């Protein structure tokens, strides 16, 4: 069974798959935050036009940008998301029992739902603020 037959979210448990996301990563050789080390710390590369070095933990979904060549990915991950369960896994993912893996993935899924819920709440609050302003402007016209 190859990695391609795994669901996309589960493919991210494989370090090589995470490494493959680091296209056009600005820090390659002679740096602490190489693609290999970033992937080992759980990060995937998800650049934007304004944030070419944006990396996100596939597990806790913490996003970090503004990397410096001497930044240690594991230490940065611990500093900004110390509760990430990925950081405490002692086995290679290929060595986990099915029960261990599913328990771990349940935590990842909870993190994903929390992140998506938080994003939707922010989006709703921004929309509500715009609507409130529009209503106030209409009321001022009367």
Curated annotation (Swiss-Prot):
<feature type="modified residue" description="N6-acetyllysine">
    <location>
        <position position="90"/>
    </location>
</feature>
<keyword id="KW-0805">Transcription regulation</keyword>
<keyword id="KW-0479">Metal-binding</keyword>
<dbReference type="GO" id="GO:0000281">
    <property type="term" value="P:mitotic cytokinesis"/>
</dbReference>
<keyword id="KW-0804">Transcription</keyword>
<dbReference type="GO" id="GO:0000086">
    <property type="term" value="P:G2/M transition of mitotic cell cycle"/>
</dbReference>
<dbReference type="GO" id="GO:0004869">
    <property type="term" value="F:cysteine-type endopeptidase inhibitor activity"/>
</dbReference>
<dbReference type="GO" id="GO:0015631">
    <property type="term" value="F:tubulin binding"/>
</dbReference>
<keyword id="KW-0159">Chromosome partition</keyword>
<keyword id="KW-0832">Ubl conjugation</keyword>
<dbReference type="GO" id="GO:0005737">
    <property type="term" value="C:cytoplasm"/>
</dbReference>
<keyword id="KW-0597">Phosphoprotein</keyword>
<feature type="modified residue" description="N6-acetyllysine">
    <location>
        <position position="23"/>
    </location>
</feature>
<dbReference type="GO" id="GO:0051303">
    <property type="term" value="P:establishment of chromosome localization"/>
</dbReference>
<comment type="subunit">
    <text>Monomer or homodimer. Exists as a homodimer in the apo state and as a monomer in the CPC-bound state. The monomer protects cells against apoptosis more efficiently than the dimer. Only the dimeric form is capable of enhancing tubulin stability in cells. When phosphorylated, interacts with LAMTOR5/HBXIP; the resulting complex binds pro-CASP9, as well as active CASP9, but much less efficiently.</text>
</comment>
<keyword id="KW-0646">Protease inhibitor</keyword>
<dbReference type="GO" id="GO:0008270">
    <property type="term" value="F:zinc ion binding"/>
</dbReference>
<feature type="modified residue" description="Phosphothreonine; by CDK1 and CDK15">
    <location>
        <position position="34"/>
    </location>
</feature>
<protein>
    <recommendedName>
        <fullName>Baculoviral IAP repeat-containing protein 5</fullName>
    </recommendedName>
</protein>
<dbReference type="GO" id="GO:0043524">
    <property type="term" value="P:negative regulation of neuron apoptotic process"/>
</dbReference>
<dbReference type="GO" id="GO:0043027">
    <property type="term" value="F:cysteine-type endopeptidase inhibitor activity involved in apoptotic process"/>
</dbReference>
<comment type="function">
    <text>Multitasking protein that has dual roles in promoting cell proliferation and preventing apoptosis. Component of a chromosome passage protein complex (CPC) which is essential for chromosome alignment and segregation during mitosis and cytokinesis. Acts as an important regulator of the localization of this complex; directs CPC movement to different locations from the inner centromere during prometaphase to midbody during cytokinesis and participates in the organization of the center spindle by associating with polymerized microtubules.</text>
</comment>
<comment type="similarity">
    <text>Belongs to the IAP family.</text>
</comment>
<keyword id="KW-0539">Nucleus</keyword>
<dbReference type="GO" id="GO:0000776">
    <property type="term" value="C:kinetochore"/>
</dbReference>
<dbReference type="GO" id="GO:0043066">
    <property type="term" value="P:negative regulation of apoptotic process"/>
</dbReference>
<keyword id="KW-0007">Acetylation</keyword>
<dbReference type="GO" id="GO:0005634">
    <property type="term" value="C:nucleus"/>
</dbReference>
<dbReference type="GO" id="GO:0007059">
    <property type="term" value="P:chromosome segregation"/>
</dbReference>
<keyword id="KW-0493">Microtubule</keyword>
<dbReference type="GO" id="GO:0031536">
    <property type="term" value="P:positive regulation of exit from mitosis"/>
</dbReference>
<dbReference type="GO" id="GO:0005814">
    <property type="term" value="C:centriole"/>
</dbReference>
<keyword id="KW-0678">Repressor</keyword>
<dbReference type="GO" id="GO:0032133">
    <property type="term" value="C:chromosome passenger complex"/>
</dbReference>
<dbReference type="GO" id="GO:0061178">
    <property type="term" value="P:regulation of insulin secretion involved in cellular response to glucose stimulus"/>
</dbReference>
<feature type="modified residue" description="Phosphothreonine; by AURKB">
    <location>
        <position position="117"/>
    </location>
</feature>
<keyword id="KW-0995">Kinetochore</keyword>
<dbReference type="InterPro" id="IPR051190">
    <property type="entry name" value="Baculoviral_IAP"/>
</dbReference>
<feature type="binding site">
    <location>
        <position position="84"/>
    </location>
    <ligand>
        <name>Zn(2+)</name>
    </ligand>
</feature>
<keyword id="KW-0862">Zinc</keyword>
<feature type="site" description="Interaction with FBXL7">
    <location>
        <position position="126"/>
    </location>
</feature>
<dbReference type="GO" id="GO:0061469">
    <property type="term" value="P:regulation of type B pancreatic cell proliferation"/>
</dbReference>
């Amino acid at each position: 069974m190859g990695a391609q037959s795994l669901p996309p979210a589960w493919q991210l448990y494989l370090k090589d798959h995470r490494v493959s996301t680091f296209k056009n990563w600005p820090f390659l050789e002679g740096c602490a935050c190489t693609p290999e080390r970033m992937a080992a710390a759980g990060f995937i590369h998800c650049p934007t036009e304004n944030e070419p070095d944006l990396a996100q933990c596939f597990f806790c979904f913490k996003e970090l940008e503004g990397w410096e060549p001497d930044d240690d990915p594991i230490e940065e991950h611990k500093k900004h998301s110390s509760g990430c369960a990925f950081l405490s896994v002692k086995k290679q993912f290929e060595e986990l029992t099915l029960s261990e893996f599913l328990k771990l993935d349940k935590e990842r899924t909870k993190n994903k739902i929390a992140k998506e819920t938080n994003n939707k709440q922010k989006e709703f609050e921004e929309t509500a603020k715009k609507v409130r302003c529009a209503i106030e402007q209409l009321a001022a016209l009367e």
